[in-house]
Curated annotation (Swiss-Prot):
ATP binds at residues 15, 164-166, 230-231, 239, 245-246, 262, 266. The lineage of its organism: Bacteria, Pseudomonadati, Pseudomonadota, Gammaproteobacteria, Enterobacterales. It catalyses: L-methionine + ATP + H2O = S-adenosyl-L-methionine + phosphate + diphosphate. Catalyzes the formation of S-adenosylmethionine (AdoMet) from methionine and ATP. The overall synthetic reaction is composed of two sequential steps, AdoMet formation and the subsequent tripolyphosphate hydrolysis which occurs prior to release of AdoMet from the enzyme. It comes from the Bacteria. InterPro entries: ADOMET_SYNTHASE_CS, S-AdoMet_synt_C, S-AdoMet_synt_central, S-AdoMet_synt_N, S-AdoMet_synthetase, S-AdoMet_synthetase_sfam. This is S-adenosylmethionine synthase. Mg(2+) binds at residue 17. GO terms for cellular component: cytosol. NCBIfam families: metK. It comes from Yersinia pestis.
C-alpha cells in the first residue's frame, strides 16, 4: 500500500447529538436496572430550551423520564442559560409507547436459545493492532482529544471552556504503518471572556500536547484550533441533536464498514447494538490471538430468527492461517445468536450511558473488549 492519509473525527459529550444519545442510554439504564428483560427503543431530540424523549418501551419498571433527562444534562455541564441550554429550566416532553406485538412475538420464545433477532440487518466489527487497544489510531486519538477537553473543563483547569466540542485527526500511513500525524482540528465552545490567542495557547498546552504521542508529531503537523475564530453559541442552541446521528464516531471513525444501525437507546435484544458489540469482540480476539493484524467481521440477521443469516471474516491479507479456517473458528468459539451473544457478553446490565460518549469500542472495561478467547483461538489454530 502506498503512502496515504486517513482522517477520523469525534465529538464531545456536550455535542447536541451526543446529549441525545446519553439521555436515551440513561433512560435505558434506568429501566434495565429494574427490569433486565425490558424492551427499549428510546429516541431523543434536543433543541434550544426543550427535550423530546420518545420511542417504544415494554416493561414493568417505572422510571422518571424528566428527572433522568435533567440529571443527564446537568452532568454533561449545561447548567446555565448563558450556555443556551439549562438542565434546570428546559422543557422535557415524553412520547413513549409500547413495542409492537408483531415484533414481540418473533423475539420472545419459550426456549431462550431460540430468541429471535429484534430486526433484520447487518453489523460489522473491526480490530487492528496499530494501537494497544486494538483500535484504529485516528478515531482513538480523536476521542481522547475531546475526552481531555471535558476533563479540563470539569476540573476547572480551563474554566472558560463550554461543553460542546469537536476533534479531527489526520494520520499519515506508509505501507499500512503509521508514520506521523498530518493535521489536528480542535473546535471548542467557550465563554465570551477568553481571547483567541489565549484560547489557542491553552488548547495546545492543556489538550493537544498531553494527548497526542510526541513520536507522531512532526514539524509539518498542522493545527486548526477554533478555525472560525469564535465558538460561543453551541450545544442545542447552535444545532438540534438527535439520537443515533454519530454512528461513525461511535464505531471505527470510518476505517471499517458500518451496517447503518445506531446503538443508543436500544436494549440488547436489538441486534443493531448487541451484534455490533459481539462482532467487535470476535474481531478483537482474532487480532489479540495473532491470527491477523487487521480483522473485520460481518454478521447478519432476519427478524424473529435466532441463527445469523451470514458470518463473514475479512483479514485484508494479514491473516496467519487460511481465511476459511478463521470463519470456522468464529463459528466454533462464538455464539452469535441473540440470546447467545447477550449471555456471552453479559449485556443485561445498566452499562450503556457510559458508551454514549467517546466511543463504544477501545475502552477496556466494557465486556465486548475482553480478549478472553484469544488463547483458545490461538491453540485451535495450531499457532505457537
Amino acid at each position: 500500500m502506498a503512502k496515504h492519509l486517513f482522517t477520523s473525527e469525534s465529538v464531545s459529550e456536550g455535542h447536541p447529538d451526543k446529549i441525545a444519545d446519553q439521555i436515551s442510554d440513561a433512560v435505558l439504564d434506568a429501566i434495565l436496572e429494574q427490569d433486565p428483560k425490558a424492551r427499549v427503543a428510546c429516541e431523543t431530540y434536543v433543541k434550544t430550551g426543550m427535550v423530546l424523549v420518545g420511542g417504544e418501551v415494554t416493561t414493568n419498571a417505572w422510571v422518571d423520564i424528566e428527572e433522568i433527562t435533567r440529571r443527564t444534562i446537568r452532568e454533561i455541564g449545561y447548567v446555565h442559560s448563558d450556555m443556551g441550554f439549562d438542565a434546570n429550566s428546559c422543557a422535557v416532553l415524553s412520547a413513549i409507547g409500547k413495542q409492537s406485538p408483531d415484533i414481540n412475538q418473533g423475539v420472545d420464545r419459550e426456549n431462550p436459545l431460540e430468541q429471535g433477532a429484534g430486526d433484520q440487518g447487518l453489523m460489522f466489527g473491526y480490530a487492528t493492532n496499530e494501537t494497544s487497544v486494538l483500535m484504529p489510531a485516528p478515531i482513538t486519538y480523536a476521542h481522547r482529544l475531546v475526552e481531555r477537553q471535558a476533563e479540563v473543563r470539569k476540573n476547572g483547569a480551563l474554566p472558560w471552556l463550554r461543553p460542546d466540542a469537536k476533534s479531527q485527526v489526520t494520520f499519515q500511513y506508509d505501507d499500512g504503518k503509521i508514520v506521523g500525524i498530518d493535521a489536528v482540528v480542535l473546535s471548542t465552545q467557550h465563554s465570551e471572556d477568553i481571547n483567541q490567542k489565549d484560547l489557542h495557547e491553552a488548547v495546545m498546552e492543556e489538550i493537544i500536547k498531553p494527548v497526542l504521542p510526541a513520536e507522531w508529531i512532526t514539524a509539518h503537523t498542522k493545527y486548526f484550533i477554533n478555525p472560525t475564530g469564535r465558538f460561543v453559541i453551541g450545544g442545542p442552541m447552535g444545532d438540534c441533536g438527535l439520537t443515533g446521528r454519530k454512528i461513525i464516531v461511535d464505531t471505527y471513525g470510518g476505517m471499517a464498514r458500518h451496517g447503518g444501525g445506531a446503538f443508543s437507546g436500544k436494549d440488547p435484544s436489538k441486534v443493531d447494538r448487541s451484534a455490533a458489540y459481539a462482532a467487535r469482540y470476535v474481531a478483537k480476539n482474532i487480532v489479540a490471538a495473532g491470527l491477523a493484524d487487521r480483522c473485520e467481521i460481518q454478521v447478519s440477521y432476519a427478524i424473529g430468527v435466532a441463527e445469523p443469516t451470514s458470518i463473514m471474516v475479512e483479514a485484508f491479507g494479514t491473516e496467519k492461517i487460511p481465511a476459511d479456517q478463521l470463519t470456522l473458528l468464529v463459528r466454533e468459539f462464538f455464539d452469535l445468536r441473540p440470546y447467545g451473544l447477550i449471555k456471552m457478553l453479559d449485556l443485561l446490565h445498566p452499562i450503556y450511558r457510559e458508551t454514549a460518549a467517546y466511543g463504544h469500542f477501545g475502552r477496556e472495561h466494557f465486556p465486548w473488549e475482553k480478549t478472553d478467547k484469544a488463547a483458545l483461538l490461538r491453540d485451535a489454530a495450531g499457532l505457537k
